[in-house]
Amino acid sequence: MNLCSSGATASTTSLSSTGQAERSGGVPGGGAEGGGGGGGSGNSGGGGKTSDVSAEASTLCFAGGSGTAGAITGTEELSNANSPANGAGGASGSTGSGQQPTGSNGHSHLHNENNANMPPETRPKMVTVKHPESNKPKPTTKKSKPIQADQDVIKALQRCRIKRLDLSKSSITVIPSTVKECVHLTELYLYSNKIGQLPPEIGCLVSLRNLALNENSLTSLPESLQNCSQLKVLDLRHNKLAEIPPVIYRLRSLTTLYLRFNRITAVADDLRQLVNLTMLSLRENKIRELGSAIGALVNLTTLDVSHNHLEHLPEDIGNCVNLSALDLQHNELLDIPDSIGNLKSLVRLGMRYNRLSSVPATLKNCKSMDEFNVEGNGITQLPDGMLASLSGLTTITLSRNQFASYPTGGPAQFTNVYSINLEHNRIDKIPYGIFSRAKGLTKLNMKENMLTALPLDIGTWVNMVELNLATNALQKLPDDIMNLQNLEILILSNNMLKKIPNTIGNLRRLRILDLEENRIEVLPHEIGLLHELQRLILQTNQITMLPRSIGHLGNLTHLSVSENNLQFLPEEIGSLESLENLYINQNPGLEKLPFELALCQNLKYLNIDKCPLSTIPPEIQAGGPSLVLQWLKMHSPYRQIDCYYQYELQTVNQAPGAGGNGGGGAAAAGGSASRSSDRR
C-alpha cells in the first residue's frame, strides 16, 4: 500500500497570503495584489481581478484551541478588513462593492455575495478569524481542547497546498495521516505541542527542507522519514529521545541538527554519514563518549557538546578543520587532545567547568580565538608564551583554578586584552609592569586571591573602569590610585585596610565604592568629592562617625554603615535627596537619629535593628522604619517652623483689613508666634 497516495481533488481550498479563502482557480472580486497584509498597499476590492499569489509566499498558521477552522498569522491581519483605505480591504474577503463582512461574538466571517449562486461543491470554504479587538475571553486549557485542536489540524491539512505550515503551540497530540496531502511543504513547524509520535505518512513530504519538532514528547522517529531526502534542518530539542534515532543517519542532506536537552547516552559510528552537517548541537544530554566518527564531519563550523559527561575527546576532533565554535563546558574532561591545535579557524573554545589540570601547548596555533576561558578547572599554569601567541584575545578568564602566579609570557600576553578575570586562585602578587602594554585593559578581577599589596605602577592603569580586589589581604592603598580617573567600580571588601587615602577624592567617575569588612576607623573628608557615587558600602568596619561632606553625594542611592561604632549621623545626611536604602543597624552607640533624616524624601528602606535609639519611643521603633520616619517628621523642628509660618500667613490673610494695615498683620503674627512658642 502506498502511504503517499493522494485523494485530494484539484478544487481543494487553500489560504492565500492575503488571508482570503480561494479556490485554485481564483475568486473574482476582491483580493490584494503584490503586498497583502494589514497595512500593505495594492489593488483592492472590486473590478473582478483574480488574486494570483505564489505558493512560495503563502503561510498557513494554526492557533490551537481557538475552536476556529484556522487562523492566519504573519504579515496578514484580517482584522484590518474594516479599513477601506488599504489593500487589505479586498483581502479581508469583502465583496467588490466594498460591503463590510459581519459576524457574531467578535468574529468576522469571510463572505462573497458572488458565491451565493455557485453550486455548493464549488463554493470557496469559509474561514473564521477572531478579531484582535474582541473582548471574548480566550478558552482556558482543558482536557477537551487538544481533541478540538487535533480536529482543526485535520481541517487545516485538508486545505494544505502551501509551502510553509506553522502548527506550533497548538496543543496538538496527534498528526493525522492526511499530512501526506501536503506534498508541496518545504517548511513544517510543529514545535511546542504534545506530540508523542509522528505518523509514517510524514515520509510523504519529499520536498521538506526544514522540520521543527522541538518541545514535544517524541521518543523515536518513523523510518519513513528517510524519504525526506532534501531535509536540511531538523530540530529535536527538548524531547524524550534516549538515543539518536537511526533514521537520522540516513538523512544525508542535513546541514543543521539540534538534539539539545534529550536523554541521549551515546553517539553511533553512523554519525560519520552526515558529512554535510555544519551545525551539531548535543548539549544537555547524558553522553559519556564522543567517538571517532566526529572527525568525518569536516564541514562542521559549530559543535556544542556542553553539559554532558564526557571525560575525553577523540584525536579525530582535529579533522574538523572548519570549526569556528567548539563548546565543551560543563563536562568531566580530564584532558584536551593535542590535535586541537589543527583547528586554526577556531574563534570560541568553551572549556569552563571541567576537570582539566592543563591545556595543550598546541592551542597557540588557534590564532583566531578572541576569548580564552578555562574557568572552574584545576589548572596550575599555562604553557609558556601561549597567551602571547594568541594575539587576538580580548577576554581572558582563568578564574576558579589553582594558579599561584600570573601566566608566563610577560606584558605581551595582554596587549589587546580588555578584560582579565583571575578570581579565586592563589596569586599573592601582581607583577610590576605586567599591564604596561595593556592599553585597552578596562576590567580586572582579582577577587579571592592572596594579595598583600598592589604594584607600585598601579597609577599607570589609567584606562581601568572596573577593579575588583575583594577578599585578599591588602593593608593599604597606594596614593597613586588617584590616577585611575576612569574608574567607575572599586571593590575592596574583605581586606585588612585601616584607612583610605585622601587621593580617593580624585576618582570623580566612581559610581560604586565597596569597603565592606575592613578595619577602617575614619573616612577622609574628600569622600564628598565623589559626586557620581551611587553605592557606598561601609558595613562591618570600625567607623565612629561619617564626615559632614557626605551630604555632597547627591546621586547616592544606597548607603550601608551597619555593624560599625557610629555615635551619631551628621545632619547633612538630610541632603541626600536620591537616597533610597539606608542601613545603620547594629551600631551599639547610636542613640538618636537626626531630624534631618526625614528630609530624605526618596528613602524606601531603613534598617535600624539593634540600635539603642533612646530618643524615639519603643512603640514607634516597634512599628518599623516607616513609622520611625513619620515620627521624625512630626517632631522635626523644621516642621514646627513650617507650621508657624503657615499659621502666620493664614492669620494675616484672615485679619480684618488684611494687606491695608501693617500693624494688624504684625499683631496677628505676634499672636501666632506666641501660640507657636507655647506649643514648643
From Swiss-Prot:
Region (Disordered): 1-54, 73-149, 658-680
PROSITE patterns with a match to the protein in the record: LRR (PS51450)
Pfam family, one: LRR_14
Skewed-composition ranges (Low complexity): 1-19, 73-86, 97-106, 669-680
Gly residues bias spans: 26-49, 87-96, 658-668
Keyword check for Secreted: no
Keywords (A to Z) from UniProt: Leucine-rich repeat, Repeat
Ranges occupied by LRR repeats: 161-182, 184-205, 207-228, 230-251, 253-274, 276-297, 299-320, 322-343, 345-367, 368-389, 392-413, 416-437, 440-461, 463-484, 486-507, 509-530, 532-553, 555-576, 578-600, 602-623
PANTHER family reported for this sequence: LEUCINE-RICH REPEAT AND IQ DOMAIN-CONTAINING PROTEIN 4, LEUCINE-RICH REPEAT-CONTAINING
Family: Belongs to the SHOC2 family.
Protein's job: Acts as a Ras effector and participates in MAPK pathway activation. Probably acts as a regulatory subunit of protein phosphatase that specifically dephosphorylates Raf kinase and stimulate Raf activity at specialized signaling complexes upon Ras activation.
Name of the protein in its database record: Leucine-rich repeat protein soc-2 homolog
Organism per entry: Drosophila simulans
Gene that this sequence comes from: Sur-8
